[in-house]
A protein has these predicted regions:
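Short, glycine-rich nucleotide/cofactor-binding loops
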Residues: 1
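N-terminal Rossmann-like or analogous alpha/beta NTP/dinucleotide-binding catalytic cores
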Residues: 15-120, 135
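Active-site cores that bind ATP or allylic diphosphates and position pyrophosphate for catalysis
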Residues: 75, 79-228
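A structural preference for short, hydrophobic beta-strand core positions in alpha/beta folds
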Residues: 10, 62, 123-124
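Short beta-strand/loop segments at the ligand-binding rim of alpha/beta enzyme cores
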Residues: 4-12, 118
Length: 228
């Protein structure tokens, strides 16, 4: 942006698109209630804004993500970005997809950029040590023993990996991905998640009075309000 003598903008979608579509799929196409707690969010809006601000970004736009907005075409969205913000360059991840039915993938947007000549597309390459596999329907579990659980695939042979993947209907994801981080946190593998995040994972919230269970389980606990 500085080289182009322009300004930088980050666009955030809130709530998370996956949360909105996941709720709609389970509730006959209904929108999630305003303010509904997103238990799968890795960071709050405030945390993201602090991180973005630390990078020196000029402006951040928070778009309320709704099913009505999701039904817009990627051409409409990009048209708004060009027409109202004067967008000259768009930076996306390699697996990004915009617009209704995720039709605006990198290839489609690249073709549009070349055809119009209005903006250029910069694609950020994937980072991290390749791919891993996570269960398709992984759910959080309480570790059975003290300490953090080990990687179930560590030291496994190819045959053992295939058997594990088949048993858990595992899907391939990037090691450095939010999907993998959620899986690791849900399994209690906090250190592995922290290694990907580059910092300790934290949950922010207001501490409230609870049932004082920490007195009975041998270690202190803190109760957070639902407004996390």
């Amino acid at each position: 942006a500085r080289k182009e003598r322009s300004f930088s903008v980050v666009v955030l979608f809130e709530p998370r698109p996956a949360m909105v579509h996941g709720y709609a799929a389970k509730h006959d196409g209904q929108e999630p209630p305003v303010g509904m707690l997103d238990t799968q969010a890795l960071t709050s809006v405030d945390e993201r804004l602090r991180s973005i601000n630390a990078l020196g970004v000029d402006y951040t736009i928070i778009v309320r993500y709704t099913l009505e907005f999701a039904a817009k075409s990627y051409r409409f969205f990009l048209g708004q970005m060009v027409g109202k913000l004067g967008m000259r360059a768009l930076v996306l991840g390699a697996d990004a997809a915009l617009g209704a039915n995720r039709a605006g993938d990198v290839k489609a947007i690249e073709n549009l950029a070349l055809a119009t000549g209005v903006f250029q597309l910069d694609v950020v390459d994937d980072h991290g040590p390749g791919e891993t596999r996570v269960p398709a329907n992984a759910k959080p579990v309480m570790p059975a023993d003290h300490g953090e659980p080990a990687d179930p695939l560590e030291g496994a042979t190819k045959a053992e990996r295939r058997a594990w993947s088949k048993k858990h209907q595992a899907k391939a994801v990037r090691v450095w991905s939010s999907t993998n981080v959620r899986y690791l946190l849900g399994q209690g593998r906090i250190k592995d998640a922290d290694a990907i995040l580059g910092h300790m994972h934290a949950v922010e919230g207001t501490v409230v009075h609870g049932e004082e269970r920490g007195r009975t389980i041998g270690f202190p606990t803190a109760n957070l309000s639902q407004d996390v």
